[in-house]
Amino acid sequence: MRTVIIGNRKLARHLLRHTLAEGWNVVGAVVPDGKLASRQANFVPVSELVADTGCRLHETDDINSTETFEWFQKLNIDLCLCGGWSQIIEPRILDVPKRGFLGFHSSRLPEGRGGAPVNWSLIDGADE
């Protein structure tokens, strides 16, 4: 299954490492470009890990751009896994992978969106 990983947090690195270790066919990764990365807290560089895999790398400051959409289409993706991105991903991007698009987040959405979702969930008294 042709898979793409999206993200810029520790979770994205874990997704990439785990899928590759399990023998998945990871064909690409989307990471923030330098401009976007410099504005994000908890940024973890995923691109250096991607460089060691031979996967295609796409750097962008807008996950919903026409350029990113066309990049997704060219890769003929079956599945996309997203772990840590700062934008809401538009339906036209979500609809590209044939088998689906899975997003991973460490709190309930939309209530827990934003930075430090686990911390804020605890501060707010969430029990799940």
Regions found by a protein language model. Name each.
Residues 1-128:
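One-carbon transfer enzymes
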